[in-house]
A protein has these predicted regions:
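Conserved SAM/SAH-binding loop-helix junction
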Residues: 1
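Class I SAM-binding transferase module
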Residues: 4-160
Length: 160
């Protein structure tokens, strides 16, 4: 848990913001088991909907999915920038301070999302339950890059 790591690294006060109630309860139990209840306060709710008792020096964020803006991080970071961070334009106020998504055209003939395999008789092409995002690893030897990667998006947390 990031809050426990921050407290063990020397943070004097940590606000662990968690929107999921059962996860927040488990976080509180983990904090208590670690003996850090005097340093870490688990705040239940979306960071965009809660008010912290004070502005913070550092945001240690896990708001990034497979690509930079997948989990709505841009809105979340902008809100934290305006309401939660003492010095939001400083790079050392954010971990991470920047997130980039890189992409490249590729050929991966073995991936069924790019072309259904002949043996997949049960697949219903119109069914949303069988729609999968295409996530390819450049380390896969069956993947052939068609061009060098290029930056697709960049989210800089220090910019208003």
């Amino acid at each position: 848990m990031l809050a426990i790591a921050a407290a063990r690294a020397g943070a004097g006060k940590v606000y662990a913001v968690e929107h999921d109630g059962p996860v927040a309860a488990k976080a509180r139990a983990a904090v208590a088991a670690a003996g850090l209840s005097d340093i870490i306060e688990v705040v239940e709710g979306m960071s965009t909907a809660i008010t912290l008792p004070e502005k913070v020096d550092l945001v240690l964020a896990e708001v990034i999915g497979t690509y930079a803006t997948e989990e709505g991080c841009y809105h979340t970071i902008r809100d934290a920038h305006a309401r939660h961070v003492k010095e939001p334009t400083r790079r050392d106020s954010w971990i991470p301070h920047t997130c980039e998504t890189w992409a490249a055209p590729a050929c991966f003939a073995l991936h069924y999302a790019l072309g259904l395999p002949a043996y997949d008789w049960g697949y219903d092409a119109g069914s949303k339950e069988h729609a999968y995002p295409v996530r390819l690893s450049p380390s896969n030897p069956a993947l052939r890059m068609l061009a060098p990667p290029a930056r697709l998006e960049e989210v800089c947390f220090t910019e208003p």
